[in-house]
Amino acid sequence: MSRVSTYLNFPRNTEEAFNFYKSVFKTQFGGNGIARFSDIPPQEDMPPLPDVDKNLVMHIELPITGGHVLMGTDAPESMGFSVNFGNNVYINLEPDTRAETKKLFDALSNGGKVTMDLQDMFWGAYYGSCTDKYGVQWMFNCVETSK
């Protein structure tokens, strides 16, 4: 079955971030749970992984809402990665109800920054946006008509 998912790189705190998301969305990690860099078999053409990086998250999956899967990894500097957060990507959530929208908005913005409070918009949605405490940007669009 085809699917689209969002893949997030973190600077050594993927497990913390995904445990937070797991508590927000009340779901469990998918696949084989948390895969660690220590799970990578040694390869001839690759230098050995530093001990400090072995427990980092190589891959993790979490179903969030509407069948969407959030995936992530730590991006170790020893492997040439550098994480730079920008303002060009949002994860857009479209909950079924205003109550669910408010619940998710409050949880994800806690410890982060509200960029637009939830409010009724001219296009007919109950809309708001925030950046969570891990630097991930979220938009909320609820089209429930009753308040």
Regions found by a protein language model. Give the residues of each.
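Hydrophobic faces of well-ordered beta-strands that scaffold small-molecule active sites
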Residues: 4-6, 91
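Short beta->alpha transition motifs characteristic of CBS
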Residues: 122, 139-147
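Core segments of cupin and vicinal oxygen chelate
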Residues: 8-67
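Vicinal oxygen chelate
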Residues: 14, 24, 64-68, 74-86, ...
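Active-site-proximal beta-strand/loop segments in catalytic clefts of secreted hydrolases
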Residues: 73-75, 141-142
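Glycine/serine-rich loop-strand microenvironments at binding/catalytic pocket rims
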Residues: 1-4, 140-142
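Residues that flank catalytic or metal-binding motifs in active/ligand-binding sites
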Residues: 56-58, 87-89, 134
